[in-house]
């Protein structure tokens, strides 16, 4: 394995599996915002998983100025509405995912143990052990991957594109610094070269510390790990070099924002060979049709082969689903909806030494492109 650092601090690998001494200690983060011992003591008063804001949330009750007290809502007309079960609605020891990308709703998981909490140069990074899904990685408060529930996302983002072309040899992964995507990609015996570009060295450090079975694949002789900006890397890549590019990014905010815009897709198309393919994470049809339509518009202007949208189910993502954009450059025809190189459960152990697939098969591959009527009409318009 070759490791290339393009970050300004130049530091990624730490000795003996220890987190670098930049403030991360014993799985805690002692920032100016007051994270200590797995608790958060911000100015707004979050402590021990309980929210004690200035608006008066305390011990599972709400005492707002609008009259929420002891599980009731007092209206201006003097009537009170009983809030059933309000005493159990706020509990310590739970992680709740809030974001402007999915307003008005949240997803919660019970935290068994906080494993790591820190702030990198780019984002807040947290890893905890959940009661249901094993280890859970979050970036800026949004769930990125769960050890026992994220395999549908990973298997599909790899096998939808690679199953659609014969004999992939040179592949680029943007993001994916934990290593789940690389793990799936190594099923293909034809692959000769894999470049991984991860912008956040702390994500890689977390992988080495808490997912050693994944980080071990960084040492595969076919793999080059680059620590730097994925958009800049693609822009500088040799034209026509890659057979496939997989963009395993977070949501289109923060450091991943550039990975959803037209200049990035233009650089991707240039870096792909004729008939090369790209697959990128493309949000949820239930919440983000406005984002999806913009991504599709950008891709149709750039990619002269085919442009397709697929989706699948992931239990720990907002609305329980996630989408993918699959595009090809002009050249040999690519029919994403009918895999020519499927790596099904029956053949997995023949083609690699890895455990059988848990989610992907040829039927699910084909079904991923069947969209609900409302989504189909908007995407095809």
UniProtKB/Swiss-Prot annotation:
Start-end of Polar residues biased regions: 23-39, 46-81
Gene3D superfamilies noted in UniProt: Spermidine synthase, tetramerisation domain (2.30.140.10), Vaccinia Virus protein VP39 (3.40.50.150)
Limits of the PABS domain: 92-329
GO MF annotations, alphabetized: putrescine N-methyltransferase activity; spermidine synthase activity
InterPro entries per the UniProt record, alphabetical: PABS, PABS_CS, Putrescine_N-MeTfrase, SAM-dependent_MTases_sf, Spermi_synthase, Spermidine_synt_N, Spermidine_synt_N_sf
Tissue expression per record: Predominantly expressed in roots.
Catalytic reactions of this protein: putrescine + S-adenosyl-L-methionine = N-methylputrescine + S-adenosyl-L-homocysteine + H(+)
Keywords: Alkaloid metabolism, Methyltransferase, Polyamine biosynthesis, Putrescine biosynthesis, S-adenosyl-L-methionine, Transferase
EC number: 2.1.1.53
Annotated region described as Disordered, given as residue ranges: 21-81
Protein's pathway: Alkaloid biosynthesis; nicotine biosynthesis
Active site (UniProt): 248 (proton acceptor)
Alphabetical GO biological process terms: alkaloid metabolic process; methylation; nicotine biosynthetic process; putrescine biosynthetic process; response to jasmonic acid; spermidine biosynthetic process
Positions contributing to S-adenosyl-L-methionine binding: 123, 198, 229-230, 317
Keyword Transcription regulation: no
Cysteines paired by S-S bonds: none
A single cellular component GO annotation: cytosol
Swiss-Prot/TrEMBL induction comment: Accumulates upon the removal of flower heads and young leaves. Triggered by jasmonic acid (MeJA).
Pfam families tied to this protein: Spermine_synt_N, Spermine_synth
Disrupted-gene phenotype: Plants suppressed for PMT1, PMT2, PMT3 and PMT4 exhibit strongly reduced nicotine levels but accumulate polyamines in roots, and have an impaired leaf maturation phenotype at harvest.
Keyword rRNA processing assigned: no
Physiological role: Involved in the biosynthesis of pyridine alkaloid natural products, leading mainly to the production of anabasine, anatabine, nicotine and nornicotine, effective deterrents against herbivores with antiparasitic and pesticide properties (neurotoxins); nornicotine serves as the precursor in the synthesis of the carcinogen compound N'-nitrosonornicotine (NNN). Methyltransferase that mediates the conversion of putrescine to N-methylputrescine. Promotes leaves ripening.
Family: Belongs to the class I-like SAM-binding methyltransferase superfamily. Putrescine methyltransferase family.
Name of this protein: Putrescine N-methyltransferase 3
Protein species of origin: Nicotiana tabacum (Common tobacco)
Organismal lineage: Eukaryota, Viridiplantae, Streptophyta, Embryophyta, Tracheophyta
């Amino acid at each position: 394995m070759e490791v290339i650092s393009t970050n300004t601090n130049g530091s990624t690998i730490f000795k003996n599996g220890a987190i670098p001494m930049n403030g991360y200690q014993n799985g805690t983060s002692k920032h100016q915002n007051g994270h200590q011992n797995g608790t958060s003591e911000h100015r707004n008063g979050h402590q021990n998983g309980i929210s004690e804001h200035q608006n008066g949330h305390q011990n599972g009750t709400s005492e707002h100025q609008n009259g929420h007290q002891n599980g009731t809502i007092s209206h201006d007309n003097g009537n009170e509405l009983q809030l059933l079960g309000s005493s159990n609605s706020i509990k310590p020891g739970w992680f709740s995912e809030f974001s402007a990308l999915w307003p008005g709703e949240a997803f919660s998981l019970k935290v068994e143990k906080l494993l790591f909490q820190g702030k990198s140069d780019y984002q807040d990074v947290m890893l905890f052990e959940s009661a249901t899904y094993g280890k859970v990685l979050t970036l800026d408060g949004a769930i990125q991957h769960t050890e026992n529930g994220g395999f549908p996302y990973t298997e599909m983002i790899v096998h939808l594109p690679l199953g659609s072309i014969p004999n992939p040899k040179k592949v680029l992964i943007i993001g994916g610094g934990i290593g789940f995507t690389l793990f799936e990609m190594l099923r293909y015996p034809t692959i000769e070269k894999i470049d991984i570009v991860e912008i956040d060295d702390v994500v890689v450090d977390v992988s080495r510390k808490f997912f050693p079975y994944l980080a071990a694949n960084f040492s595969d002789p076919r793999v080059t790990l680059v620590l730097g900006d994925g958009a800049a890397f693609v822009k500088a890549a040799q034209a026509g070099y890659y057979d496939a590019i997989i963009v395993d990014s977070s949501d289109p905010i923060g450091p991943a924002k550039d990975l959803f815009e037209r200049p990035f897709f233009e650089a991707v198309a240039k870096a792909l060979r004729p008939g090369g393919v790209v697959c990128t994470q493309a949000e949820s049809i239930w919440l983000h049709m406005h984002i999806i339509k913009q991504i599709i518009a950008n891709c149709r202007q750039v990619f002269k082969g085919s442009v397709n949208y697929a989706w699948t189910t992931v239990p720990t993502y907002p609305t329980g689903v996630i989408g993918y954009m699959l595009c090809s450059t002009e050249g040999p025809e690519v029919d994403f909806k009918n895999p020519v190189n499927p790596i099904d459960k029956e053949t997995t152990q023949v083609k690699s030494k890895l455990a059988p697939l848990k989610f992907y098969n040829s039927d699910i591959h084909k079904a991923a492109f069947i969209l609900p009527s409302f989504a189909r009409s908007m995407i095809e318009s």
